[in-house]
């Protein structure tokens, strides 16, 4: 039975990403809990295992026990592909991270641009039928990131762990015909950096696992303004030091700018899609001529993979060459952009006017899962 008073409670927010899921409550400044989007299942069930033995592990606990587990990523390239594991991850967030009963509070979940219809309806079914939420809403990650910058019209460049996309938004609505996606993002840059480091001739005193290379990437990688010039600089000009977990210090050079270069030149990963600057230009030129100038003047970066030092300057430089002469271009790079989407969700669910937006359990019962197609856009 739908309880209308549940809409007065702070909403639960799940920002579902390929690499991280961020969970928290409406009205707060940031997510309370951030977990890796990983579910691990035991490779072998001990014969003496009792009924209480855990069958699966989520997030960091799964990564910690990875030797004994088979790891699964329920979100691939931004899209949910493993629904059973996704449900386990959400259950973990509700019960163990937030400590809330799903039936007590409304839930806003984020979704990627161009999320397929079947995925949207499946999520509504899982939330209403399996978790018993009183109300639910699905919101575009790029639109929420734009809200976090106090804008309703602009172009969002969103790059996380699994996918990079450019999303034009007009008065709070994304323009799907002009969305551009690239399957090169954080995890691809980490893999490329690993290959480059191994090929560089360095000897590493400890294993180059994903966690270590991720840390090197986040602390030292950068985007060069002029990549050819950067590679011709003297080694001592580009070398940066990194302290390994065993205390040894190594000096790293060219790979630090070569790996993020894949965002601007995906061809180096065998991907024939255009790079970031051309994606932005292409998305904007697919929009109505009347709003193209506005979009060039309000480009907002979102997602952890846009945090590379120099990325905004390089994007601006290349867009100035691609845009028509005298087009004003402004790129906003919020410092907290790795969770901009979550902040936007916290803002919109705090508005009193949002109460009428919720798809309630009664709506779901009356109209079925297709109700999200009409109500969440």
Curated annotation (Swiss-Prot):
- GO CC entries: cytoplasm; cytoskeleton
Which cysteines are cross-linked by disulfides? none
Major location category of this protein:
cytoplasm
Supply the SMART domains for this chain: ACTIN (SM00268)
| Keyword terms, alphabetized | Cytoplasm, Cytoskeleton
The entry's localization annotation reads: Cytoplasm, Cytoskeleton
Q: Which SUPFAM superfamilies match?
A: Actin-like ATPase domain
Q: Which PANTHER family match?
A: ACTIN
Q: Which family does it belong to?
A: Belongs to the actin family.
Give the protein's recorded name: Actin-related protein T2
Q: What organism is listed for this UniProt entry?
A: Macaca fascicularis
């Amino acid at each position: 039975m739908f309880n209308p008073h549940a809409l007065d409670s702070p909403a639960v927010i799940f920002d579902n990403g390929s690499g991280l899921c961020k969970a928290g409550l409406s009205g707060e400044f940031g997510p309370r809990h951030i977990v890796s989007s990983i579910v691990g299942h035991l490779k072998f069930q001990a014969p003496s295992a009792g009924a209480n033995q855990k069958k699966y592990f989520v997030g960091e606990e799964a990564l910690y026990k990875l030797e004994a587990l088979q790891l699964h990523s329920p979100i691939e390239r931004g899209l949910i592909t493993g629904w059973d594991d996704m449900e386990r991850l959400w259950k973990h967030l509700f019960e163990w991270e937030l400590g809330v009963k799903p039936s007590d509070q409304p839930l806003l979940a984020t979704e990627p641009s161009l999320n397929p219809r079947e995925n949207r309806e499946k999520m509504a079914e899982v939330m209403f039928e399996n978790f018993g939420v009183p109300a639910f809403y699905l919101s575009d990650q790029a639109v929420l990131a734009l809200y976090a910058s106090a804008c309703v019209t602009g172009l969002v460049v969103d790059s996380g762990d699994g996918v990079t996309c450019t999303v034009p938004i007009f008065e709070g609505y994304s323009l799907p015909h002009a969305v551009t996606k690239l399957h090169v993002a954080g995890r691809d840059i980490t893999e490329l950096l690993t290959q480059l480091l191994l090929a560089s001739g360095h000897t590493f005193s400890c294993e180059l696992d994903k966690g270590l290379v991720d840390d090197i990437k986040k602390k030292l990688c950068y985007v060069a303004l002029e990549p050819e010039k950067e590679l011709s600089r003297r080694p001592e000009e580009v070398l940066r030091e990194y302290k390994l977990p065993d205390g040894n210090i190594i000096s790293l050079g060219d790979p630090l700018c070569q790996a993020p270069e894949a965002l601007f030149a995906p061809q180096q990963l065998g991907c024939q899609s255009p790079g970031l600057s051309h994606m932005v230009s292409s998305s904007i030129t697919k929009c109505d001529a009347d709003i193209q100038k506005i979009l060039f003047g309000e480009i907002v970066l979102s997602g952890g993979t846009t945090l590379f030092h120099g990325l905004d300057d390089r994007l601006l430089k290349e867009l100035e060459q691609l845009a028509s002469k005298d087009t004003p271009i402004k790129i906003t790079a919020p410092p907290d952009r790795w969770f901009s989407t979550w902040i936007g969700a916290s803002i919109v669910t705090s508005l009193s006017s949002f109460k009428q937006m919720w798809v309630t359990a009664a709506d779901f019962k009356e109209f079925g899962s297709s109700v999200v197609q009409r109500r969440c856009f």
